[in-house]
Amino acid sequence: MDPKILERLRLGLSDDERRLVIRSATGGEEVTEYSFGIEEEYFLVDAKTLDVAIRTPDDLFDAANWSTGGQAMREMLQAQLEVATNVHVDVGDAREELKFLRREVASVAGQYGLTILACSTHPTALWRNSQPTPKPRYAEMMEDLRIVGQRNMLCGMHVHVQLPDPDRRFAVMRAMIPYIPVFIALSASSPFWNSRETGLKGYRLAAYDELPRTGLPELFTSKKQYDRYVAALTKSGVMPDESHVWWAMRPSLRHPTLELRAPDVCTAVDDAVAIASLYRALARHLYLNPELADAVGNVERAIAVENKWRAQRYGTDCLFVTEDGPVTGQEILNRTIADVAEHAEALGCLAEVERCRTIMQFGSSADYQLQAYRESGGQLAAVTQWIAAATVSRAEPPQSQPSVEPVR
């Protein structure tokens, strides 16, 4: 292996980390069915105060991009940074790479007096102070979106799963609609907004849905239908290309993947990998059983819209609407895992899928943030301190387990 790769990536790490990033630097895993990748967005914050960084230097992003081998990049606002893993088949490699990327961008940010927070809303950031990234693409977006774009001080997690057949990919997207609220509940990490407790576990999507072309996917049955929709919008000058379709799930513009975009960014890496693994196993289940898409129609989508709201509001504590009456999140998850267990086993990620039960039982990042807030007597600084510690290490949870909100 060319030693310049190691020098370029600034590696003086363990053998396992060295092996992982060498693989990444030389092309990653071979792309196969159900291979996957994870994208995460972080807030850049002052390393001492943990206040969000409104303006950030170009050099920081150049250094982060160089340091990670091209896997860190700007986002729409200067306060944000995105990382993307390589394509993976082995879930353990994906976990280690995600840990590496977090440590690496935090290290680079530290050279500028900054660090990163993995949460979907910054507890004290004021969206009115946000500044767009000085790139033509983002300037055009801000010209179109105006205040809605400025309010987009939000970070999410996206998971790509490779599904080669285009029409079957759309069958999976349709069949996946009722499950999207489960991913929202498991990932919720945005209970605060503009220094206020919102009352929602996942406020991010409430703000994000102000943008056009968001929310749950439409009930398209084929790539041809989707292409007609995209063509109408692009020919009418509404958007330059299909990357401006910002649904909670969408087919990728550049890759043969189906991209889950609904989740909040997880504060804990293990939670992120668990949710990505559940999505991957479910995608395999639905891809191999395309007839399941036929069961998702207007009624099922309308119920999913309601459940999306309930997942945002109550997180892991919510009751989900079904035609047979209310069902707990834990029961919905148990049923889902029963359906996908053999697929998770085949993909080598059953243990990660099982971790979703722990999240549903004890809570997501939002619950731990709220616990830190209450145990500190309502100090938002305690919340950001916990997030900062948990983003790049296995931080201890607040002193007691999150209190369980009465289910509604």
From Swiss-Prot:
Keyword set includes Zinc-finger: no
SUPFAM superfamilies: Glutamine synthetase/guanido kinase
Function field: ATP-dependent carboxylate-amine ligase which exhibits weak glutamate--cysteine ligase activity.
Cited NCBIfam families: gshA_cyan_rel (TIGR02050), PRK13515.1 (NF010039)
Keyword Glycoprotein: no
GO biological process, one term: modified amino acid biosynthetic process
Stored Pfam families: GCS2
Family: Belongs to the glutamate--cysteine ligase type 2 family. YbdK subfamily.
Protein name from the UniProt record: Putative glutamate--cysteine ligase 2
Annotated EC: 6.3.2.2
HAMAP family the record matches: Glu_cys_ligase_2 (MF_01609)
Catalytic function, reaction form: L-cysteine + L-glutamate + ATP = gamma-L-glutamyl-L-cysteine + ADP + phosphate + H(+)
Stretch forming the signal peptide: none
PANTHER family (UniProt xref): GLUTAMATE--CYSTEINE LIGASE 2-RELATED (PTHR36510:SF1)
GO molecular function, a single term: glutamate-cysteine ligase activity
Keywords assigned: ATP-binding, Ligase, Nucleotide-binding
